[in-house]
Amino acid sequence: MVSLKDRFHCPGYKIVEDRRIRCHKVGGHGAEDFAQGIMNSCNPVFIELGLRLGSEKYYSYFKQFGLLQKTNVDLPGEAATIMHNPKNIGQVELATISFGQSFQITPVQLATTVSSIINGGNRVTPHFGAYVTDEKGKKVKTFKYETTEGIVSEKTSETVRMLLEKVVSEGTGKNSAIKGFSIGGKTATSQTLPRSANKYIASFLGFAPADDPKVLGLVIINDPKGCLLYTS
């Protein structure tokens, strides 16, 4: 469907049917390959990929990644994903879904899904307990949790880790780079409803080490102030 060296052109927007959907860089990123599109968080690149996949295939990936079901985190009251009925996904809806808008997932779901993709491709269930210690700090019980079947291949997982490391070392997430550490991550900006309010949510998800993740963190800022709406 796409290779890292596939070429794209970003003039600052993408025309889909009768809509002009903007990139965050008004003047556009110009010529770029797919890897650079990820690093630049370029909407037209994500839109083009979504249109190549088509709504049926895209929706199937939502199912494959577990995004249409709850994570079963061990806390009550978990909210479910809000997503279009597949029958109602036209070209414009698919275009906006492809760069992370027009649907809603919880922060726990986002962290869970990314963890599952970058850990080699095995779906995990988030938990709040790893082990129990006594008053001296000695482990007296270690909880063991099952992982499920792979949602992506090991090769795909490796490629995603590599791309997200470049986001931090060279792309929109470079403010989160720390000398001596290998970090992967992704910036994100989503517009809230109603769109006429012109309000956004900025977020950054990071993990380390980039080649063998052991820790992942997610920062979310509601209605950030300033000219840059992505965060790192």
Residue ranges and their predicted role:
Residues M1-I221:
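Beta-lactam-recognizing serine transpeptidase/beta-lactamase-like catalytic domain environment
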